[in-house]
Regions:
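Short, well-ordered, mixed-charge alpha-helical segments that flank or form enzyme active sites
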Residues: 91, 114, 127-129
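Glycine-rich, small/polar surface segments that engage phosphate groups of diverse ligands
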Residues: 40-112
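A short, well-structured juxtamembrane/interface segment
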Residues: 24-44
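Hydrophobic packing residues in well-ordered alpha-helices of helical domains and bundles
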Residues: 12, 31-34, 60
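A short, small-residue-rich loop immediately preceding and capping a beta-strand
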Residues: 47-51, 114-125
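Non-DNA-binding regulatory cores of transcription-related proteins
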Residues: 111-114, 118, 135-137
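Generic N-terminal amphipathic, Lys/Arg-enriched alpha-helix
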Residues: 1-26
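Glycine/threonine-rich flexible loop motifs
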Residues: 126-137
Length: 138
């Protein structure tokens, strides 16, 4: 396989153009509302739970790290967070013994309290385990 610098440059240019176009469609009012919800949860001592499958699980885990540690950089207490996708043992236990569609909702019914917050990350929005109704856990 030959290295084709022009093809790689072209692909990178197309990719960055796509990222820039998507960034311009960001709903910043919605992001501000989400930030407000997270800050209010922190102020009342609530836990912020995150969930996702595959790459979205990695994103869900990473935001927990950022919320927990990121504030400490500025001499503020971090947020109480937990990623429901971080334990392979728990996820495979629940999936095997009950249903993979319920790997997150079972954890929430056990751990979560009224007023806690759930952030679900999904690239497609189609994963049954990432689809929650307001009554499925709270």
């Amino acid at each position: 396989m030959d290295f084709d610098g022009k093809a790689i440059s072209s692909a990178l240019l197309e990719y960055t153009g796509d990222v820039a176009a998507r960034a311009m469609r960001t709903d910043f009012d919605l992001l501000a509302q989400i930030a407000r919800t997270l800050i209010e949860a922190k102020e009342r001592g609530a836990t912020i739970y995150t969930a996702g499958n595959g790459g979205s699980a990695a994103t869900a885990s990473h935001i927990c790290n950022d919320l927990l540690k990121g504030c400490r950089v500025h001499n503020r207490e971090g947020f109480k967070t937990e990623c429901l996708a971080d334990s392979c043992a728990v996820m495979t236990c629940l999936g095997n013994d009950f249903s993979y569609e319920e790997i997150f909702s079972i954890q929430l019914r056990t751990k979560a309290h009224r007023g806690d917050v759930l952030l679900v990350y999904s690239g497609s929005g189609n994963s049954p385990s990432s689809q929650f109704s307001s009554n499925s856990w709270a």
